């Protein structure tokens, strides 16, 4: 209600304050034309100059031409897909590998219901959620490291 209420201009105290400039932003410098006309274009042109300068000084090198007949021995996905790739690569039945990947979001959706009795926000006071988080983090890191290795060393990470 206070936002929509208009000032009472018939009040002499209010008119005296407005006459002195109170109630308005009378300090600093105005945005037009100082900021919008002078400072913003300088910043925009400076940014463009930096980008063009970096592109000229350090151009991106062109790679070799694509050769469809020379494929690498093992094609790896992007780094963020390594754990999923490792599951599909190691599990013998591909349908089971896809089922394992659908269990991950289902398991994450069950965590709040498993620990619904515990209303604490401190993660150290929520043992089930903390255990699921740590297990998932370590499993994801383990699978990601294993995906970057050859298939015979991927499960043991070459340690034994």
Curated annotation (Swiss-Prot):
Transmembrane segments: 36-56, 95-115, 128-148
Key words, A-Z: Electron transport, Membrane, Photosynthesis, Thylakoid, Transmembrane, Transmembrane helix, Transport
Gene3D superfamilies per UniProt: plastocyanin oxidoreductase (1.10.287.980), Single helix bin (1.20.5.510)
Gene Ontology CC: plasma membrane-derived thylakoid membrane
InterPro entries, A to Z: Cyt_b/b6_C, Cyt_b/b6_C_sf, Cyt_b6/f_cplx_suIV, Cytochrome_b_C_euk/bac
Subcellular location: Cellular thylakoid membrane
Topological type in the membrane: Multi-pass membrane protein
GO molecular function: electron transporter, transferring electrons within cytochrome b6/f complex of photosystem II activity; electron transporter, transferring electrons within the cyclic electron transport pathway of photosynthesis activity; ubiquinol-cytochrome-c reductase activity
Keyword Magnesium in annotation: no
GO biological process terms held by the UniProt record: photosynthetic electron transport chain
Main function: Component of the cytochrome b6-f complex, which mediates electron transfer between photosystem II (PSII) and photosystem I (PSI), cyclic electron flow around PSI, and state transitions.
Family the UniProt entry places it in: Belongs to the cytochrome b family. PetD subfamily.
Subunit composition and interactions: The 4 large subunits of the cytochrome b6-f complex are cytochrome b6, subunit IV (17 kDa polypeptide, PetD), cytochrome f and the Rieske protein, while the 4 small subunits are PetG, PetL, PetM and PetN. The complex functions as a dimer.
Entry protein name: Cytochrome b6-f complex subunit 4
Organism in which the protein naturally occurs: Synechococcus sp. (strain CC9902)
Gene name, Swiss-Prot/TrEMBL: petD
């Amino acid at each position: 209600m206070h936002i929509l209420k208009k000032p009472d201009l018939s009040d002499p105290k209010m008119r005296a304050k407005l006459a002195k400039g109170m109630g308005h932003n009378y300090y600093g410098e105005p945005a037009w034309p100082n900021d919008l006309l002078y400072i913003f274009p300088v910043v925009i042109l400076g940014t463009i100059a930096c980008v063009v300068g970096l592109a000229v000084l350090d151009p991106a090198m062109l790679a070799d031409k694509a050769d469809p007949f020379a494929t690498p021995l093992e094609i790896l996905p992007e780094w963020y897909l390594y754990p999923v790739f490792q599951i599909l690569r190691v599990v013998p039945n591909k349908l089971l590998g896809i089922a394992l990947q659908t269990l991950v979001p289902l398991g994450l959706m069950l965590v709040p219901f498993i620990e619904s009795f515990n209303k604490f926000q401190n993660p150290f006071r929520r043992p089930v959620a903390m255990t699921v988080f740590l297990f998932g983090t370590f499993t994801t890191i383990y699978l990601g490291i294993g995906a970057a290795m050859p298939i015979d060393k991927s499960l043991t990470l070459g340690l034994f």
